[in-house]
Amino acid sequence: MTTGALPCCFGGQTMKLEGFGIFVKDMATMVRFYRDVLGFEIKEDENTSNVFLEKDGTLFLLYRRSDFENMTNTKFHYAEKINGHYEIALSVENYSAVDKTYSEVLEKGAKSVMSPTTEPWGQRTCYISDPEGNLIEIGSFVK
């Protein structure tokens, strides 16, 4: 039996996760939210069709929907309101930091989806959404 992760290779090349992105309708609003509310660092000009942000070494791309559709010559359908297709998971130091961070991001304009609660598996967690309804979890396993 093998333990640990096996490297994934394609044509002799290793593939690794560098970051992730979401397609956005209102670039300015979304840049402000991730920068000012959640503390992401902007890595390039924020007035382009895609904006790279970074949080703790992970790249996070905001890509303007209309520009992507023009590039691919395809019309896509997007979720409205709260989007339950995925979450962006952020961790904080401990249980009390979950509560404090939740209060702070609500004061800065995040929308509450679920207030802090301690789950049976030992995680204290809460959910907020960004201005376009993407779910964001803030949690910790440290009491």
Where are these regions (language model features)?
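Conserved beta-strand-loop-alpha-helix junction that forms the acyl-donor binding cleft
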Residues: 24-27, 120-121
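Conserved active-site tyrosine of GNAT-family acetyltransferases
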Residues: 30-35, 105, 130-133
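Residue-level signal for the nucleotide or nucleotide-sugar donor/cofactor binding architecture
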Residues: 22-25, 93
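Vicinal oxygen chelate
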Residues: 8-18, 41-129, 140-143
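Conserved catalytic core of two-component sensor histidine kinases
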Residues: 21, 28, 99
